[in-house]
Amino acid sequence: MHSLDEPLDLKLSITKLRAAREKRERTLGVVRPRALHRELGLVDDSPTPGSPGSPPSGFLLNSKFPEKVEGRFSAAPLVDLSLSPPSGLDSPNGSSSLSPERQGNGDLPPVPSASDFQPLRYLDGVPSSFQFFLPLGSGGALHLPASSFLTPPKDKCLSPDLPLPKQLVCRWAKCNQLFELLQDLVDHVNDYHVKPEKDAGYCCHWEGCARHGRGFNARYKMLIHIRTHTNEKPHRCPTCSKSFSRLENLKIHNRSHTGEKPYVCPYEGCNKRYSNSSDRFKHTRTHYVDKPYYCKMPGCHKRYTDPSSLRKHIKAHGHFVSHEQQELLQLRPPPKPPLPAPDGGPYVSGAQIIIPNPAALFGGPGLPGLPLPLAPGPLDLSALACGNGGGSGGGGGMGPGLPGPVLPLNLAKNPLLPSPFGAGGLGLPVVSLLAGAAGGKAEGEKGRGSVPTRALGMEGHKTPLERTESSCSRPSPDGLPLLPGTVLDLSTGVNSAASSPEALAPGWVVIPPGSVLLKPAVVN
């Protein structure tokens, strides 16, 4: 007896198949419909209407035990699964494929005639293919392994409507001949199309050719070029079976198997060797003093000897500059850096805040609302003050031309920044933009309370010159601290020393930590 754990043999007789089913039912019991669903790989348990092409009940696999079944399935006896449809479909008189002895034993009803199989539709439209249905709603269904339904592979035939591969069609101008073999196409192009033209040499008229009619001065060059269109690769590696269109590429490839490296670096003291000249040329760029490939992002001064290194830098840091931005950079060059101090000191009586480039400040290269380039040079804030800042003459120790005590900076009225780069445009939360020093002593008390405590801890690490400058910047008893020379500690947050933004002095702008860089500079 055949085992049902093996793939189903469609040549089993009715008696053997029924005996195997009865023996399995005695040992395993009745298989539930959901178990049969899982065995057949059916996920959806929702009721589905019967297929219009399903065969009548006599053609279904089912147990002989009656059971109440839904209207979508009907009880049907076991039938012979053969490799061909029932003979009643082919014979004109509707004769059955089952013997009279099997019909007379009472187990099997008479097989339906050919007229009952009219709505039956076969797979792929081929009448010789077998199609059967399993009653999923019956209780005593036959347990079939999933491997039983694996059909043998069939030869795939392409539809005549599908287009032929492009390499088998001659795309030469006014020539669309079809070929079955690639060699036939290559011979056709080489014999009929590769011909010299008057005053032009060997020109390629293949559809979509990038040369656009520019000819070759030799026939062998034309034949090599044609291989880019026909995809011909006649040179094959005997070791790994890779094919190449040019013999030189095959020779270079063979060196990967032999380990030969004939190209040596020409620089003295460098004995690196390479298998091809292009890799050696890339290596020789590392010995150049000049680095012609540089980053075009404002504020970035990276330069490289190899273009691939520049591409890696641009991809890693997001320094993508469009053509429009490059034109603006050429029209508006970045300002020159400030001159160094004549006495070698860090600064005289001012401070500068360097605003980073747009990519570092906003986190992305594409800023449609921001005019580029943003000047990468330092922004001098030492001379910025509110409107009525030219107070009393307490300006001892200041540089010439600077106002007296410089009041809190008002970045919203900054004349050095264009209008889109106000305090709100830079994404800086504006606490107060009040002009003047109308706050009085009470607001001065708040201003003194907003000084971070970390700034006091930094006094022990300062140089003597920094201690002198910080001593001059202590807040006066009547109002706000005097600038320039004030030590600003931006490393702490807004609420580090004050519980609310109201503790800040009027006119000050809260700058997030890490957004700006304080740098000593010279005020001319």
From Swiss-Prot:
Protein's cellular compartments: Nucleus speckle; Cytoplasm
Region feature Transcription repression, mapped onto this chain: 148-171
Biased amino acid composition, Basic and acidic residues: 459-469
Tissue specificity comment: Expressed at high levels in kidney and at low levels in heart, lung and placenta. Expressed in colon.
PROSITE patterns found in the cross-reference section: ZINC_FINGER_C2H2_1, ZINC_FINGER_C2H2_2
UniProt keyword Magnesium, yes or no: no
GO molecular function: DNA-binding transcription activator activity, RNA polymerase II-specific; DNA-binding transcription factor activity, RNA polymerase II-specific; DNA-binding transcription repressor activity, RNA polymerase II-specific; RNA polymerase II cis-regulatory region sequence-specific DNA binding; sequence-specific double-stranded DNA binding; transcription cis-regulatory region binding; zinc ion binding
Site description Cleavage, residues in chain: H287, Y288
Gene Ontology CC: cytoplasm; non-motile cilium; nuclear speck; nucleoplasm; nucleus
Keyword Thylakoid: no
Region described as Interaction with CTNND1: 35-174
Keywords: Activator, Ciliopathy, Cytoplasm, Developmental protein, Differentiation, DNA-binding, Metal-binding, Nephronophthisis, Neurogenesis, Nucleus, Repeat, Repressor, Transcription, Transcription regulation, Zinc, Zinc-finger
Noted disease: Nephronophthisis 7: An autosomal recessive disorder resulting in end-stage renal disease during childhood or adolescence. It is a progressive tubulo-interstitial kidney disorder histologically characterized by modifications of the tubules with thickening of the basement membrane, interstitial fibrosis and, in the advanced stages, medullary cysts.
Stated family: Belongs to the GLI C2H2-type zinc-finger protein family.
PANTHER family according to UniProt: GLIS FAMILY ZINC FINGER 2 (PTHR45718:SF8), TRANSCRIPTIONAL ACTIVATOR CUBITUS INTERRUPTUS (PTHR45718)
Notes concerning its domains: The C2H2-type zinc finger 1 has a major repressor function and is required for CTNNB1 binding.
Protein's recorded name: Zinc finger protein GLIS2
Organism in which the protein naturally occurs: Homo sapiens (Human)
Name of the gene: GLIS2
